[in-house]
Amino acid sequence: MQFSENTPPGILPCQSIEVLIAGGAIPSDTPLDVDQVQPASLDLRLSDQAWRVRASFLPGSRRVEDRIADVSMHTIDLSGGFVLEKGCVYIARLQERLTLPKGLIARANPKSSTGRVDVFVRLLTDSGARFDDVAEGYDGPLYL
């Protein structure tokens, strides 16, 4: 699958997402579950690592984990589950990462179920200038 400036804009169907996964553009700490691939999206999963931080941030020209070191209150092991405290800010590394080909960008939207439980979620990437947007050719980890 080739992407370029001539590729028409739009949302990728599940078949294209599956090609990206098979081609290594969406590697994961653990194998992807078949039900993660939706008709035009991919459900992402939390890793075992999270941080409670003083405030949300955009990393600017830095790596997310370098910025976390500046504002982290403590590290959280999610392997046994964890209850979020209301009014607190957390950042969690995702199991999936991206190695986007040229000509392809990505955008994240929270699942409606997170809003129903009053959780506000934004995606962060290394050197990201905007929440929820993944730049063309991005190669790196993802965080919520």
Where are these regions (language model features)?
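Non-catalytic terminal segments and appended small domains
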Residues: 1-143
